[in-house]
């Protein structure tokens, strides 16, 4: 009778050990599956990082344009009166303009005009500067005589200008709430016989090869930016 009890206890012990081992194996498999599901896909993370970078860059450009509008709204000049532009006129000008980023701080409007000369007739080159110290911000706007020239200018994206790779994008029209009228240039060059104006925000060069369409009969100076 004692032998039977010992044999029974041994059988129960073996069954208990097998069940325990089975549970441990199940836990190991489950943990392995969970670890596998938590692995990060490098390609997916790279795409997410790139999208975030593009969103931040777009927001930065948007903020810079808003800041420029606010600064230029308080600009003043001597001897020249600005002609207010309607929203429709502003939008039409923007369709003929491009944004140029990563511009060398020592670059002049004339140098930018020469760099984009082959794209078509240029009406205006505007280099934005800090209001406080007058130093360039590192970006500019170029207004062409026709919106067809914008497509050619966009092909200049990532070209080298003064040893730096510039970024060229279509100019976005600012929101109606941010006024773009009554603005002036910090050094304006308008062909033969034109006077230069002074303000705190930007400098411009305007080609004298062709008259600006749509502004005959207006005052001698206008500021679309």
UniProtKB/Swiss-Prot annotation:
Molecular function via GO: poly(A) binding; RNA binding
Q: Where is the composition biased (Acidic residues)?
A: 1-36
Principal localization reads nucleus
InterPro entries linked to this entry: Nucleotide-bd_a/b_plait_sf, RBD_domain_sf, RRM_dom
Q: Where is this region: Disordered?
A: 1-42
Q: Is Coiled coil a UniProt keyword of this protein? A: yes
On the tree of life, the source organism's domain of life is Eukaryota
Does the UniProt entry include the keyword Cytoplasm?
A: yes
Write out the annotated subcellular location.
Nucleus; Cytoplasm
Residue ranges annotated as coiled coil are 14-74
Spell out the PROSITE patterns in the cross-references: RRM
This protein's GO CC annotations: cytoplasm; nucleus
Q: Name one GO biological process term.
A: mRNA 3'-end processing
Q: Identify the keywords attached in UniProt to this record, alphabetized.
A: Coiled coil, Cytoplasm, mRNA processing, Nucleus, RNA-binding
Q: Where is the RRM domain?
A: 96-173
What does the record's free text say on domains? The RRM domain is essential for specific adenine bases recognition in the poly(A) tail but not sufficient for poly(A) binding.
- Say what the protein does: Involved in the 3'-end formation of mRNA precursors (pre-mRNA) by the addition of a poly(A) tail of 200-250 nt to the upstream cleavage product. Stimulates poly(A) polymerase (PAPOLA) conferring processivity on the poly(A) tail elongation reaction and also controls the poly(A) tail length. Increases the affinity of poly(A) polymerase for RNA. Binds to poly(A) and to poly(G) with high affinity. May protect the poly(A) tail from degradation.
Identification of the protein by name: Polyadenylate-binding protein 2
């Amino acid at each position: 009778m004692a032998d039977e009890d010992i044999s029974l206890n041994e059988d129960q012990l073996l069954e208990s050990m097998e069940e325990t081992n089975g549970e441990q194996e199940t836990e190991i498999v489950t943990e392995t599956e969970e670890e596998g599901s938590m692995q990060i896909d490098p390609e997916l993370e790279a795409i997410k990082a790139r999208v975030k970078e593009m969103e931040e860059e777009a927001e930065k450009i948007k903020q810079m344009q808003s800041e420029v509008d606010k600064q230029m709204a308080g600009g003043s000049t001597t001897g020249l009166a600005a002609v207010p532009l309607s929203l429709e006129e502003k939008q039409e000008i923007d369709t003929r303009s491009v944004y140029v980023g990563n511009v060398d701080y020592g670059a002049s409007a004339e140098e930018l005009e020469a760099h984009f000369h082959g794209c078509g007739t240029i009406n205006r080159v505007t280099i934005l500067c800090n209001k406080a110290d007058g130093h360039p911000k590192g970006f500019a706007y170029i207004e062409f005589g026709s919106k067809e020239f914008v497509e050619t200018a966009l092909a200049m994206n990532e070209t080298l200008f003064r040893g730096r790779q510039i970024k060229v994008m279509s100019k976005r029209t600012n929101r109606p709430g941010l006024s773009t009228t009554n603005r002036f240039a910090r050094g304006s060059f308008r062909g033969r016989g034109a006077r230069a104006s002074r303000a705190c925000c930007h400098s411009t060069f305007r080609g004298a090869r062709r008259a600006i369409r749509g502004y005959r009969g207006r005052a001698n100076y206008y500021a679309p930016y």
